Curated annotation (Swiss-Prot):
The family this protein is said to belong to: Belongs to the influenza viruses hemagglutinin family.
Compartments it resides in: Virion membrane; Host apical cell membrane
Keyword terms, alphabetized: Clathrin- and caveolin-independent endocytosis of virus by host, Clathrin-mediated endocytosis of virus by host, Disulfide bond, Fusion of virus membrane with host endosomal membrane, Fusion of virus membrane with host membrane, Glycoprotein, Hemagglutinin, Host cell membrane, Host membrane, Host-virus interaction, Lipoprotein, Membrane, Palmitate, Transmembrane, Transmembrane helix, Viral attachment to host cell, Viral envelope protein, Viral penetration into host cytoplasm, Virion, Virus endocytosis by host, Virus entry into host cell
UniProt topological domain (Cytoplasmic) ranges: 536-550
Name of the protein in question: Hemagglutinin
Role, per record: Binds to sialic acid-containing receptors on the cell surface, bringing about the attachment of the virus particle to the cell. This attachment induces virion internalization either through clathrin-dependent endocytosis or through clathrin- and caveolin-independent pathway. Plays a major role in the determination of host range restriction and virulence. Class I viral fusion protein. Responsible for penetration of the virus into the cell cytoplasm by mediating the fusion of the membrane of the endocytosed virus particle with the endosomal membrane.
Transmembrane segments: 515-535
Gene that this polypeptide is encoded by: HA
Annotated membrane topology: Single-pass type I membrane protein
HAMAP family, alphabetized: INFV_HEMA (MF_04072)
Length: 550
């Protein structure tokens, strides 16, 4: 394509930037829809569908809940002394022992999950005057009746059940978790058959706390052939403290303690399969990459994960403002510089030059300005990820029915946090996009001004991103302009002379229009005079008669 106004004594140099036929729409602070040459998606909207077992240690609960594994349900014995980073509970988990309830189930589950271990230490509790190791047909261990392996069901010995008073000090330097329980018989007959007394009582104390439980005797819905229940309780004994257990019946005693650890282990409900792969971020839907700052896969996460937002898509501009190249314009197929449109097909840079001189036409990228823009944009995605990705986990929240108001408040807080992060993400991306577009526009303007300062009076700004150079400028001359070594003094005299000649020709060419208009006016006047004279002559000879009626 030819550039306008060229002959052997002049040249034309245009500056422009990269463009693509179909850009990407992004949002900025000042414009909801602006087209750029390239953009990166910031929201991860899909998972792998599987949970990766690396770098986190994943423990698959299979058909056991964490609490069943903690108590020692017979079908969960494989989990004894296990450790994990993330315990995965399955929807098909079930209990196969004596029916029980945990009044503070959510707290116990969360406490054990964060500890990341089921390491159990057996202690020598002395239970005098009672029968130990009680079992039930509802809790088969093999063909025989059994019970939870971490608990000791105490019943009467003969016809007596003495008052039990046992102490166990914590002489170690770590917290100890003791699990114990209270049996609620279904009938008074069952109560006396097991514990002699018509009503038992269990009190468990430390220096910091005390719990007293009185059994509730009564029939309940049948579960695995039992209408009685066991309530599970737990006590933490600090270093230097003492555990005191006092009971006259219905005690489900501890066999030892669980060693508590501090850490960032957690628990998650998921039916996604566990596979051999690597992923830092895990959701109930499966693992997701954490190479994006945001995700809308699931609010529940574990590991170094993107922030959860409501948006399905947020695009970060990683290219310049896109102005697709116009089709050939004008009689000679002229094209303009960056002020009118971008240039398609410039694959070796973002900014560049097009020229036409006596040696022909050419195009070259300006690598320095291109690299300056790329260097500033490349770090944007990493900076956004650093601002949002943190090593934390958002666990599931569970509340009992009596804690409904707390659950509502928790849900409100979580929803508010998500709303805030969604808004912050929108603003953050819009700000970064605005900065990117301003930055790339600035680099184009810098290159244009740099070229203008080099050419000075040797060229004229054509107003469309191009310069008309008023001296002969071969390819070596064009290259010197591009690389900044152009010396305008060398060409100044030639440029001034050519400028005056070209302007003079343009001035003389302008008089032709005036002459044409004057000639046309005189011709019209003479034609009117001749016509009028002919009419007057014809009237005098009588060839034309003119009647005027009033």
């Amino acid at each position: 394509q030819d550039l306008p106004g060229n002959d052997n004594s002049t040249a034309t140099l245009c500056l422009g930037h990269h463009a693509v036929p179909n850009g990407t729409i992004v949002k900025t602070i000042t414009d909801d829809q602006i087209e750029v040459t390239n953009a990166t998606e910031l929201v991860q909207s899909s998972s792998t569908g599987k949970i990766c077992n690396n770098p986190h240690k994943i423990l698959d609960g299979r058909d056991c809940t964490l609490i069943d594994a903690l108590l020692g349900d017979p079908h969960c014995d494989v989990f004894q002394d296990e450790t994990w980073d993330l315990f995965v509970e399955r929807s098909n988990a079930f209990s196969s022992c004596y029916p029980y309830d945990v009044p503070d189930y959510a707290s116990l589950r969360s406490l054990v999950a964060s500890s990341g271990t089921l390491e159990f230490i057996t202690e020598g509790f002395t239970w005098t005057g009672v029968t130990q190791n009680g079992g039930s047909s509802a809790c088969k261990r093999g063909p025989a009746s059994g019970f939870f392996s971490r608990l000791n069901w105490l019943t009467k010995s003969g016809s007596t059940y003495p008052v039990l008073n046992v102490t166990m000090p914590n002489n170690d330097n770590f917290d100890k978790l003791y699990i114990w329980g209270v049996h609620h018989p279904s009938t008074n007959q069952e109560q006396t058959n097991l514990y002699v007394q018509a009503s038992g009582r269990v009190t468990v104390s430390t220096r910091r706390s005390q719990q007293t439980i009185i059994p509730n005797i009564g029939s309940r819905p049948w579960v695995r052939g039992q209408s009685g229940r066991i309530s599970i309780y737990w006590t933490i004994v600090k270093p230097g403290d003492v555990l005191v257990i006092n009971s006259n019946g219905n005690l489900i005693a501890p066999r030892g303690y669980f060693k508590m650890r501090t850490g960032k282990s957690s628990i998650m409900r998921s039916d996604a399969p566990i596979d051999t792969c690597v992923s830092e971020c895990i959701t109930p839907n499966g693992s997701i990459p954490n190479d994006k700052p945001f995700q809308n896969v699931n609010k529940i996460t574990y590991g170094a994960c993107p922030k959860y937002v409501k948006q399905n898509s947020l695009k970060l501009a990683t290219g310049m403002r896109n102005v697709p190249e116009k089709q050939t314009r004008g009689l000679f197929g002229a094209i303009a510089g960056f002020i009118e449109n971008g240039w398609e097909g410039m694959i070796d840079g973002w900014y560049g030059f097009r020229h036409q001189n006596s040696e022909g036409t050419g195009q070259a990228a300006d690598l320095k300005s291109t690299q300056a823009a790329i260097d500033q944009i490349n770090g944007k995605l990493n900076r956004v990820i650093e601002k949002t990705n943190e090593k934390f986990h958002q666990i599931e929240k569970e509340f009992s029915e009596v804690e409904g108001r707390i659950q509502d408040l928790e849900k409100y807080v979580e929803d508010t946090k998500i709303d805030l992060w969604s808004y912050n993400a929108d603003v953050l991306v819009a700000l970064e996009n605005q900065h990117t577009i301003d930055l790339t526009d600035s680099e184009m303007n810098k290159l244009f001004e740099k070229t203008r300062r080099q050419l000075r009076e040797n060229a004229e700004d054509m107003g469309n991103g191009c310069f008309k150079i008023y001296h002969k400028c071969d390819n070596a001359c064009i290259e010197s302009i591009r690389n900044g070594t152009y010396d305008h003094d060398i060409y100044r005299d030639e440029a001034l002379n050519n400028r005056f000649q070209i302007k003079g020709v343009e001035l003389k060419s302008g008089y032709k229009d005036w002459i044409l208009w004057i000639s046309f006016a005189i011709s019209c006047f003479l034609l009117c005079v001749v016509l009028l004279g002919f009419i007057m002559w014809a009237c005098q000879r009588g060839n034309i008669r003119c009647n005027i009626c009033i």
